[in-house]
């Protein structure tokens, strides 16, 4: 009789992880993916509603939604595994950043000389005198 009770306990300990795994695969795992796809659909619909208001200047001709790639919610890992590190990208792509003209960089370069010292009292163009504020600075 003791041997029979031992078999049931052993069977129960073997069946519990199997039931837990089945429950996880059938109930827990599909729910985040379904809700994520519903949210992506809502975001795409919202972006399509905004596109006619913005006009054709957006240039989104390839049909891909940028909301899916930009939202951090869709970059999370599902389950209890390790999270994939999220690589932060700049808002402006590198190619467009090189094409943009930044006035701030030019004014900062005028305020400092080649050695990183500030130029005080510059009153003319850059070729007037190349010193730190007056003509008789050094020699």
Swiss-Prot record:
One of its GO terms (biological process) is neuropeptide signaling pathway. It holds the Pfam family Sulfakinin. Its main location: secreted. It is found in: Secreted. It comes from the Eukaryota. Residues 36-71, 81-109 form a propeptide. Residues 1-35 form the signal peptide. The modification Phenylalanine amide is found at residues 80, 120, 137. PROSITE patterns: GASTRIN. The modification Sulfotyrosine is found at residues 115, 132. Transmembrane segments: none annotated. The keyword Signal applies. Keywords: Amidation, Cleavage on pair of basic residues, Hormone, Neuropeptide, Secreted, Signal, Sulfation. One of its GO terms (molecular function) is hormone activity. GO terms for cellular component: extracellular region. The keyword Secreted applies. Belongs to the gastrin/cholecystokinin family. Drosulfakinin-0 (DSK 0) plays diverse biological roles including regulating gut muscle contraction in adults but not in larvae. This is Drosulfakinins. It comes from Drosophila pseudoobscura pseudoobscura (Fruit fly).
